[in-house]
């Protein structure tokens, strides 16, 4: 599962913006 982490506030996951 990829999370949208633009600000980097997703449990340390680096997803696509």
From Swiss-Prot:
Modified residues (Cysteine amide): 17
Single GO molecular function: toxin activity
GO terms for cellular component: extracellular region; host cell postsynaptic membrane
Chief localization: secreted
Cellular compartments annotated: Secreted
Biological role stated in the UniProt entry: Alpha-conotoxins act on postsynaptic membranes, they bind to the nicotinic acetylcholine receptors (nAChR) and thus inhibit them.
Family: Belongs to the conotoxin A superfamily.
Full protein name: Alpha-conotoxin-like Sm1.4
Organism, as annotated: Conus stercusmuscarum (Fly-specked cone)
